Amino acid sequence: MDFPLGVDISAYQYSSDGKRKPNFDIINAKCEFVAVRAGISWGYQDKWFQYSWQHLTVPRMAYHVIYPEESAVNQMQHFLNIVRPTDTDRLVLDVELDHGQTKTKITDTLIKCLEYVREHTGLSNVAEAI
């Protein structure tokens, strides 16, 4: 079975001085999709998100790392302020961090995040990455 080739891009793929960047000509030619980290929680924006987002010509997904103990509304307002998605973009909520929270708390926060994004974007294709 063949799977589509995609990559994940965040500030970690750039040098600290910004001189080394991903080669978007190669990425756009070889990849079928790209996931780009938009931010984390309610206060961090990946400093290379906009640059990466603007240089992609393949289907793209913006992902946001969720902190389960923080306000879902604040986190999703921050996410949507960064991304401003179109109806062809895909949004992904990254819920890999538990920060010592219970499964119930993590699930509750995720559900609130999904509800907020769906209500404020009309997008029903929001995915969760665990």
Where are these regions (language model features)?
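Substrate-binding cleft of extracellular glycoside hydrolase catalytic domains
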Residues: 2-123
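Acidic carboxylate-rich catalytic motifs and surrounding loops in phosphoryl-/glycosyl-chemistry enzymes
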Residues: 128-130
